[in-house]
């Protein structure tokens, strides 16, 4: 009940464009801490005992606005552990609070908490990451060319703030964000590594701006969610973008609009990359390449080069995104036809959308998480002294099942067997290390209990739906299985 009340307070402040006071609310940091615990099954939460309070946040913000705040970033700051500790403390705390304030109104849990009050109709299937693959299976077989795009980064932090102000109307919050970013400008590299979620939000906000421009040009209507006078100002802003586009491409602006409305164009964005797939010719794809580069440079002041957009033919190229390697391959098929006394043998080629899991990338992610080495040999994980054997086994089994669940769409399951073997043996070595014994003697004492925990397969789940005598479950298990309840990328699949 308290959590739902917190979400309702967030909604009230969000709709009144008054976010700055929320930074001083303790439940904001409780929500941020809870999301950090549940975000990944692989995160080792070593700072789970840290407590946030409004008093700490007030002191940290006061410290930012003090006249001598530059002492924190002085060259001698490394000699003063107190200032170094405060630097890390307030940057981590305030960035988490700011992101959670802006992110929560768009989160599924927030929508669920308001469902009864506002009668919001939701569709969990559309939120699923896996929902894109059935769409690709139906559409990509009819497409010819694909453009792999490396999305350019903004050259200055002020561009990011300017992009965000069309979504966040609270001037105080934007002023704090601007001051916060420029204060940390000298140590932005190390800060971005510690606060990846913060910079990921800023980056997505910036990319959303030019994506919304494309959508606006395509639909010829405003899809913005703002109310009152805000919608009018934003509509003016979008018409200003169109006017600027007309000035840049004065000769062929109508051709550009016709290009944007191409019904055979499909767009997918994943992290810092995006994919444009089309049924048209390579000439049409090169036009897209030209317009995109000029649009980034002229409208969003982002330096880009044509080399960041590569055009390939789908029949000779594989798509690498969301932890899968997707490609269109041709299966030869010979058909014998009989006509009276003559028979004909016809060779046909059937297109098939093939999706596999990159085993090398998965092993690399497991090695980065210290489950194995770079060659795939399992390693033991350090276990806490107060962790029971069942807790350790449950953690490894949860990781294994989540990986199997996420990569269930692969048409080749053998790579998943190797991953399960690594996790199972890593679990056994972790338990043997805790009990100060060998893996062989520990497995002999434990028996088959450890193995049974890892034997829950997706095929067994499907067999509960279909009759055991039917071969449907086996055919489905051998092929791709897409789950429509996956709303985030598994950290092990996120190997980029």
UniProtKB/Swiss-Prot annotation:
Q: Does the keyword Ion transport apply?
A: no
Report if keyword Coiled coil is assigned. Answer: no
Cellular component, GO, one term: chloroplast
Pfam families, per database record: Intron_maturas2, MatK_N
Spell out the subcellular localization from the entry. Plastid, Chloroplast
Which GO biological process annotations does it have? mRNA processing; RNA splicing; tRNA processing
Write the record's keywords in alphabetical order, separated by commas.
Chloroplast, mRNA processing, Plastid, RNA-binding, tRNA processing
Query: Per UniProt, what is one GO molecular function of this protein?
Result: RNA binding
Coiled coil: which residue ranges?
Answer: none
What InterPro entries is this protein classified in? Answer: Domain_X (IPR024937), Maturase_MatK (IPR002866), Maturase_MatK_N (IPR024942)
Q: What does this protein do?
A: Usually encoded in the trnK tRNA gene intron. Probably assists in splicing its own and other chloroplast group II introns.
The protein's matches in HAMAP family, at most eight in alphabetical order, are given as:
MatK
What is stated as this protein's family in its record? Belongs to the intron maturase 2 family. MatK subfamily.
Designated name of the protein: Maturase K
UniProt organism field:
Paeonia officinalis
């Amino acid at each position: 009940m308290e959590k739902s009340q917190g979400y309702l307070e967030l909604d009230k402040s969000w709709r009144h464009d008054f976010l700055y006071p929320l930074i001083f609310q303790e439940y904001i940091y409780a929500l941020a801490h809870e999301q950090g615990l549940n975000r990944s099954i692989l995160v080792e939460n070593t700072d789970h005992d840290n407590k946030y309070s409004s008093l700490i946040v007030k002191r940290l913000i006061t410290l930012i606005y003090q006249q001598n705040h530059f002492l924190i970033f002085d060259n001698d700051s490394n000699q003063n552990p107190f200032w170094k500790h405060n630097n890390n403390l307030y940057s981590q705390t305030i960035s988490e609070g700011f992101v959670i304030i802006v992110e929560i109104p768009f989160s599924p849990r927030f929508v669920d908490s308001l469902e009864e009050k506002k009668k919001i109709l939701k569709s969990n299937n559309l939120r699923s990451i896996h929902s894109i693959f059935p769409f690709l299976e139906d559409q990509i077989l009819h497409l010819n060319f694909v453009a792999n795009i490396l999305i350019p980064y903004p050259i200055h932090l002020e561009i990011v703030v300017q992009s965000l102000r069309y979504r966040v109307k609270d001037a105080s919050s934007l002023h704090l964000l601007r001051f916060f970013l420029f204060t940390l400008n000298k140590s932005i590299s190390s800060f971005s590594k510690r606060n990846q979620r913060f910079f990921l939000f800023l980056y997505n906000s910036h990319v959303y701006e030019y994506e919304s421009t494309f959508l606006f040009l395509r639909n010829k209507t405003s899809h913005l969610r703002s109310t009152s006078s805000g919608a009018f100002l934003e509509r003016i802003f979008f018409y200003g973008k169109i006017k600027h586009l007309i000035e840049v491409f004065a000769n062929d602006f109508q051709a550009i609009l016709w290009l944007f409305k191409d019904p055979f164009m499909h767009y997918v964005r994943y992290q810092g990359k995006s994919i444009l797939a089309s049924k048209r010719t390579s000439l049409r794809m090169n036009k897209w390449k030209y317009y995109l580069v000029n649009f980034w440079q002229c409208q969003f002041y982002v330096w880009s080069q044509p080399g960041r957009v590569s055009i390939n033919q789908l029949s000779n190229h594989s798509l690498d995104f969301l932890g899968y390697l997707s490609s269109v391959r041709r299966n030869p098929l010979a058909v014998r036809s009989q006509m009276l006394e003559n028979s004909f043998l016809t060779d046909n080629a059937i297109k098939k959308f093939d999706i596999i899991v990159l085993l090398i990338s998965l092993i690399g992610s497991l090695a980065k998480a210290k489950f194995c080495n770079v060659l795939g040999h399992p390693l033991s994980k350090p276990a806490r002294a107060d962790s029971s054997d069942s807790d350790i086994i449950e953690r490894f089994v949860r990781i294994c099942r989540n990986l199997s669940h996420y990569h269930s769409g692969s048409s080749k399951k053998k790579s998943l067997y190797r991953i399960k073997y690594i996790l199972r043996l890593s679990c056994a070595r972790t338990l043997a290390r805790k009990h100060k014994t060998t893996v062989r003697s520990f497995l002999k004492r434990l028996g088959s209990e450890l193995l049974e925990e890892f034997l829950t397969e997706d095929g067994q789940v499907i067999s509960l739906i279909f009759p055991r005598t039917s071969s449907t479950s086996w055919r489905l298990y051998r092929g791709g299985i897409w789950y429509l309840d996956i709303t985030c990328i598994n950290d092990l699949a996120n190997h980029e």
